[in-house]
Amino acid sequence: MSVVFVAASKLPTPFGEFTMHGFLDEESGKEHVALSMGDIADGAPVLGRLHSECLTGDALFSLRCDCGFQLEGALAAIAEEGRGVLLYLRQEGRGIGLLNKIRAYELQDGGADTVEANLQLGFGADQRDYAMCQPMLAHLGVSSLRLMTNNPRKVKALESYAITVAERVPLQKGLNKHNRRYLATKAGKLGHMLGSLHQGEAETT
């Protein structure tokens, strides 16, 4: 994978000022972003998150998922610590794209769960790839993370690229009546570590 650094700039946010680093995957043409705060290249494990793009949750305030809540929670945690990094990866809809995500939502409106909808459309349950994270983190001088995630697949992916996950930091945010079944499905079918509440619901949904 050929991921190259393009440019960096300051990015003031409600949580504090980050540095925004832009990267281009020359093979796919996708543009990825890293937001960093503080000295993250000192060798110590860095509080971090891999966040896949979710237009509906991150920008349109959707309550169907927990993505927007996790994005805000991760940025707030980094700002509170004064040091950390968030990789914003252009992998909308767990890798199936925005329009296919809307198609999946339509199937979910008809009774399918989030995994069943993907499969009915001919996709895998989760088509994301995290190979771009290695060159992005290498450019930033990061080799060890305290990873904010509920997804064990992200931990395994990073470790397969020789990035140390020194700690998994739970990021359980945004449970509501609209996403309760969605989160239960992620726990029951995708192995996300969301606590006994979601696991129990997944087993009975």
Swiss-Prot record:
Keyword Signal annotated: no
Record EC number: 3.5.4.25
Gene Ontology CC annotations of this record: cytosol
Hydrolase keyword on record: yes
Keywords of this entry: GTP-binding, Hydrolase, Metal-binding, Nucleotide-binding, Riboflavin biosynthesis, Zinc
List of catalytic residues: 126, 128
Essential cofactor(s): Zn(2+)
Role played: Catalyzes the conversion of GTP to 2,5-diamino-6-ribosylamino-4(3H)-pyrimidinone 5'-phosphate (DARP), formate and pyrophosphate.
Assigned protein family: Belongs to the GTP cyclohydrolase II family.
Protein name from the UniProt record: GTP cyclohydrolase-2
Organism: Pseudomonas aeruginosa (strain ATCC 15692 / DSM 22644 / CIP 104116 / JCM 14847 / LMG 12228 / 1C / PRS 101 / PAO1)
Lineage: Bacteria, Pseudomonadati, Pseudomonadota, Gammaproteobacteria, Pseudomonadales
